[in-house]
């Protein structure tokens, strides 16, 4: 039986274990994010990253979210890092004042990531790029959980065409 899983925060070890348990001829599809807009945002950030020396990720979620930063924010930072051969040149932790450690965000593969948890959000993320004289902001907002359904349906329809472990909705978006 093919399987479609949507959750956040699975470790690489857990993914390897899942890949090992997937029976031959079946597909285990894991999506850290089912919103097509969020997947496109990550792809756009990956494309922009080589052209900007500074990049930061800001993610906003409801106050009951169990992980910080979100899996989407972590993956975005990884994609930015992979697509360029430099870390952000934005001021780092050395600029944090005493008593405000963490104000510059968590560094994930050289990219500062900031997590905000508050009532009123479902899920939002923006990636801010900077270079001399310009900034580029790429933002995605989910205001309602119905935004996940097109990606869920795409995953369900596409899982029949794959074998083994497939990670990420972008693998099915043409």
What are the functions of these language-model segments?
Residues 2, 6-29, 39, 43-48:
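Rossmann-fold NAD(P)-binding glycine/threonine-rich loop
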Residues 53-174:
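C-terminal substrate-binding/catalytic lobe of Rossmann-fold NAD(P)-dependent oxidoreductases
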Residues 1-4, 139-141:
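Well-ordered, non-transmembrane segments within structured domains
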Residues 36-43, 75, 151:
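Short amphipathic alpha-helical face segments that pack within enzyme cores
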Residues 8-10, 33-35, 62-63:
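Short, ordered loop/turn segments at secondary-structure junctions
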Residues 27-28, 32, 37, 53-59:
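Conserved beta-loop-beta element that borders a ligand/cofactor-binding pocket
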Residues 22-30, 131-138:
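Glycine/charged-rich beta-loop-alpha catalytic/anionic-binding loops adjacent to active sites
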Residues 1-2, 23-32, 96-108:
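Short charge-dense sequence patches
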């Amino acid at each position: 039986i093919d399987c479609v899983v949507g959750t956040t925060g699975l470790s690489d070890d857990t993914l390897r274990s899942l890949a090992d348990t997937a029976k031959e001829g079946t597909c285990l599809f894991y999506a850290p994010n089912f919103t097509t807009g969020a997947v496109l945002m990550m792809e756009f950030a990956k494309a922009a990253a080589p052209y900007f020396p500074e990049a930061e990720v800001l993610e906003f979620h409801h106050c009951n979210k169990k992980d910080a930063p979100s899996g989407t924010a972590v993956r975005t930072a990884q994609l930015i890092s992979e697509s360029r051969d430099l870390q952000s040149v934005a001021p780092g932790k050395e600029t944090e004042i005493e008593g405000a450690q963490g104000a510059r965000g968590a560094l994930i593969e050289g990219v500062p990531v900031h997590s905000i948890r508050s009532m009123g959000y479902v899920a939002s993320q923006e990636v801010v790029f900077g270079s001399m004289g310009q900034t580029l902001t790429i933002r995605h907002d989910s205001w309602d959980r119905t935004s996940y359904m097109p990606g869920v349906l795409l995953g369900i329809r596409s899982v029949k065409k794959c074998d083994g472990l497939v990670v990420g909705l972008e693998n099915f978006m043409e």
